[in-house]
Amino acid sequence: MIIGLTGGIGSGKSAAADFFIDLGISVLDADQVAKEALSTNSPGYTDFISQFGEVYLNNNREVDRLKLRELIFSNPSKKKDLENIIHPIVRSAISNFIITSTSPYSIVMVPLIFETNSYKNYDKIITVDCDLELQIVRASSRDAQNKSQIKNIINKQASREERLSISDDVLINNSTLSDLKKQVNVLHTKYMELLNE
């Protein structure tokens, strides 16, 4: 069974994923794969320079992610160009992960699962959800961005309603990490029972 794990920025996806890992479940972070797709030793890096030019590199010749983020949020066609570089790399990594995973079920953490229509590729979808204000506070403190930047990112992502509409299971992360862990344990038990039917 392959499960997609999603949620908006600052919802607690990574915390939930870590709890599944603690239970022995294989988890792939598609966002991390996407970030690594533009690292200096990757094929995506070369494609990136060809497409975007060296103006989006910092002094260390690494992709200047802040500058790039500003570009793609203001220019939809550039966002599409970037996706055309990154998405094939991510899809390949997900395929390899699924083939090689040995845990009873596997989880792929995909923040933009609704936006990319990739939710159709999974047996189940888990959404980590939390109140909007909590989401903004968490994301702005973690990512060193101001609240208006975080709100802008949230407005560009799928709405809570859209994410929840494709979800089989929802983890409500409005409380403590301990509470989130309990919810993950309940889901894990449910999935193990499903697999043993």
Curated annotation (Swiss-Prot):
Keywords linked to the UniProt accession: ATP-binding, Coenzyme A biosynthesis, Cytoplasm, Kinase, Nucleotide-binding, Transferase
GO biological process entries: coenzyme A biosynthetic process
Pathway(s) annotated for this protein in UniProt: Cofactor biosynthesis; coenzyme A biosynthesis; CoA from (R)-pantothenate: step 5/5
GO CC aspect terms: cytoplasm
Annotated compartments: Cytoplasm
UniProt keyword Aminoacyl-tRNA synthetase present: no
Annotated catalysed reactions: 3'-dephospho-CoA + ATP = ADP + CoA + H(+)
Sites where the protein binds ATP: 10-15
Domain DPCK intervals: 2-197
Catalytic class of the enzyme: transferase
Pfam families attached to this UniProt entry: CoaE
UniProt EC number: 2.7.1.24
Coarse class of the protein's main subcellular location: cytoplasm
Keyword match Ion transport: no
Described function: Catalyzes the phosphorylation of the 3'-hydroxyl group of dephosphocoenzyme A to form coenzyme A.
Entry similarity comment: Belongs to the CoaE family.
Protein name: Dephospho-CoA kinase
Annotated organism of origin: Gamma-proteobacterium EBAC31A08
